[in-house]
Amino acid sequence: MNNSVPTTAICPPACRACGLRKTGAFSPIAVEELDFIEAFRSGTTTASAGATLLHEQKPNGKLFTLYAGWAFRYKTMSDGRRQILNFLLPGDFIGLQQKFADGSMHGIEAITDCSLCVFPREGLWELYRNHPSLGYDITWLAAREEGIVDDHLLTAGRRNATERVAMLLMHLYRRLDRVGMAENGWIDFPINQQHIADALGLSLVHTNKTLRRLRQLGLHEIEDGRLRLLNTRALERIADYYDTPPAQVPLL
C-alpha cells in the first residue's frame, strides 16, 4: 500500500526530500539521476486556483512537475467554447508538447492552489544525451498520456452520458488512489459540474441529471468537495472501463 501524499503543499528545496517519492507510487531512481534532476530543476512556483499556467499558442520555455494541487489541460474555440483534455494530478509532468510545437498546443489552468517544480525546456537535450534512462522515462510518460487521450476519445465518440460520467469518476478515483490520496473510499474532488461537462462534451443540464441518476442508484456521493464511490464494480461495468494505473510511474 502506498503511503499518503505529502502533508505540505510546498515543493521541498531539495529533490531528495520530495514527499511524492516517499509515497511508493513512483519508480525508484538512481542517486546520480536524482542529482541531475535537482540540477536540472530551475526552481519552484505556486499558482492560485483559477490561474493560467500555460497559455494556448504562447510558449514560455518551461516544463513543470505538479507537486500538489489539481489543474487541467484545455483547448478553446474561437467562440469561447472549451474542451478539457485531461485533469492533472500530483506527479504529472506538464508542458512537453510545447517542445515539439510552435508554442503550447493547449492551455493549463489551476483548479486549486498548486505547487510546481520548474524545469527549463532547453535542458531536455542534455537529459536525453547524458541520461538515457530519464529520457526513456519521459517517453514513457508521453506514451501513457497518449493512452489516456485514446480513452477520452473513445469516451467522447462512443460512450453515452451515463457511461462517460461513470468512466470519469472511476478514472480520477483510480489515479488518486494510486498516489495515496484516497482515504476510506473518499477522495478530494474540487472539480465542479462545468468542469465535468467540458471534459465529457456534455451540456451542464445533462451532466447534472447524469450525476443525480448515478447517485440515486447508490453508486457515488459528492459532499463538500469530496467524492466517495460506493460501488466501483458497478461503475466499471456501466462505463466498460477497467483500466488500472500502473503501481509505479516515473517522476521528474
Please annotate each region the language model reported.
Residues 1-49, 93-94, 99-100:
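Cyclic nucleotide-binding regulatory module and flanking cytosolic helices
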Residues 86-151:
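Cyclic-nucleotide recognition modules
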Residues 25, 36, 51-113:
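Cyclic nucleotide-binding regulatory domains
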Residues 46, 64-65, 109, 221, ...:
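Well-ordered beta-strand positions
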Residues 174-252:
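Phosphate-/nucleic-acid-contacting segments
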Residues 68, 122-123, 194, 233:
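Alpha-helix/helix-capping structural signal
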